[in-house]
Amino acid sequence: SSLYGGTLSYKTFDILAQYYDCDKDEQTWQKLSTFDQTAKKGQVSGLWSKVYTLLVNVNTIIEACDERKEVLNSEYYHVIKGEALALRGLLHFEVFRVFGPIYSVDPETECMPYSESSDLKVRPLLKASDVARLMIDDFKAAEELLKEYDPVIKKGALWGDEGPGLPNDMVYRSLRLNYYAVKAYIARLALYTGDKAKAYAA
């Protein structure tokens, strides 16, 4: 909730953009709105560390899907790994939007590492164009995994439980990073990098 319940939705960057009138009663936000370096550094570095911590967890799921594939049925394997790959692309995209360059101006600027493993090794900064390519690779891999197995494609948004004692893992798919959300992120990333044809095709 600290990311999507605030920092990446309505809070930190909207305050920095002066969308809100923060008075003295809201001391933390007022400091942020006046570009107080301590307040800004805490919010922004918190975003960076939180996202990369989440990426370790996501990569652990991706690795476990392949290492323990025999314990998952085919539907679970494809949906869980597909969602995790999409989430990896999404988390990198959020950091990319905040810390990356203006893509249309300088796509060759080194801006951030791309985390594809659960180990804690320090990775080199990559060019924005390389980060964009890796994100699209993750989204495309997720799309391939989900397209035959995500229940949302054939059954739509299932809002009811399966029934007493039955698992609900494959219902409420409209609240998850499902097949259509992945396609939307492919289009969004393509627009962000200026590839309108790829965005339209998505």
Describe the residue ranges of each PLM region.
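Acidic, glycine-rich segments characteristic of secretory precursors and extracytoplasmic regions
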Residues: 1-14
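Extended ligand-binding groove/face enriched in aromatic
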Residues: 90-118, 137
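Carbohydrate-binding/catalytic loop surfaces
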Residues: 17-18, 110-120, 157-174
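Short coil/turn linking the two alpha-helices of tandem helical-hairpin repeats
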Residues: 96-103, 150, 192-195
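Conserved, well-structured interaction surfaces
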Residues: 27-99, 121-130, 144-146
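Flexible helix-coil transition and linker loops at the boundaries of alpha-helical arrays
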Residues: 67-76, 145-173
